[in-house]
Amino acid sequence: MNIQEPEHITMVRDSVRRLLDEIATPAHAAQWDKDDRIPRDLILPLAKLGLCGMAVPEEYGGHGIDIRGVLAVIEELAKRSAVLSGLYIANTIYGSFNINASGSPTQKQFFLPKLANGELLFAYGLSEPNVGADLTGVQTRAERRGDKVIINGAKRWCSGADTNDYIYALVRSDKSEDRRKNLSILLIPRATKGITITTTNTMGQRGVSTCDVSFDDVELPFEETVLGGETGWNKGWTLLAGPTLEAEKVQVPAMAVGIATAALDEAWQYAQERKQFGVRICAHQSVRHMLVDAKTKLLACKLMLHHCTELVAENKPAAIEVSMAKLYVAETCVQIVMDCQKILGAYGYAEGFQMERLVRDIIVLPIWGGSSAIQKNNIASMYRLPKD
């Protein structure tokens, strides 16, 4: 069964694969994981190839919004390196999509050309030490004082905050009792007085730091900092749940499919090369069944991803389908990678082999972008399933 993609998407995939053979070999990916550091300037050759411009309108120096292309790039990058895929997400999904959808004219003029050129990366500052799934409970506060905004509080699990240029932060900006009407989104330059950033070691996705960020009387210009300027003040929840939400969710299934594809490719090849009991292990029924099950599950994941991509690209309602894809694809791709690890045996467990890294990188995806439990709650609510 073939997934019919537009011809230009096939060309994009081919171009990305050729570029990766130059700038991101398997040895590079292994080294970034070992060092827990990926060079941020790797975004520049992606931009030079025009990949960052697929998230920016032509009038701002891009090639026009192409969600199909962006998600294809995320998938292809993740096959080689999840953290390289993360760099691209920090530029396109976190940066360009949000600013193009909700930024003020001044913000668009300032940010979008730089994002198209690969000059800027954004970190997501939504979660806090005491706030995870319930984002309406954020405690970081922003106070307006004339033409300034003063920020105090803390963010947690803010990937890339120590190296990326801006932090896209959800804050409480008013005392309204309706928790959805007193939130704003701020674009906070990392190198600002009053910001302290510390890092946390993580199991996987090594190369981009996971950070805690604290704000101590951080003072910034109001119009430049509040997403949308004056019209965005106290409209943060509307913007967060707005036109870019589905694109932000579907990037997780795209990364998951990329990682799972890499794992299955390796297991498929290994099973044809490894011999035990006088035959290749792919001749043993148990291994054959594991490989076929993985192939079947991966195709189902790709079909769900493709369906959601088309809905989002055509601006059709996709909230339920995207939540289902986030739930099913993330969970299923974890299963695929874990089964592929079993096929490699000890070689799938030992450091220095790609499979061990793929296992560590995939584990977090059912948590990212809204956990599987939250997706199930959301899906049930969207189907209006009674709670009493």
Cite the ranges covered by each PLM segment.
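Amphipathic, small/basic residue-rich leader segments at the start of a protein or domain
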Residues: 1-87, 110, 114-117, 335, ...
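Glycine-rich phosphate/cofactor-binding loops in nucleotide/flavin-utilizing enzymes
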Residues: 2, 13, 72-73, 94, ...
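Glycine-rich beta->alpha junctions and the first turn(s) of the following alpha-helix
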Residues: 3-12, 196-299, 365, 381, ...
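C-terminal helix-coil-helix/basic helical segment that borders enzyme active sites and/or dimer interfaces
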Residues: 27-34, 268, 272-279, 295-328, ...
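N-terminal glycine-rich flavin-associated loop
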Residues: 86-106, 132-135
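A short, Trp-centered hydrophobic/proline-enriched beta-strand micro-motif
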Residues: 118-126
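A structural signal for short hydrophobic beta-strand segments in well-ordered beta-sheet cores
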Residues: 140-143
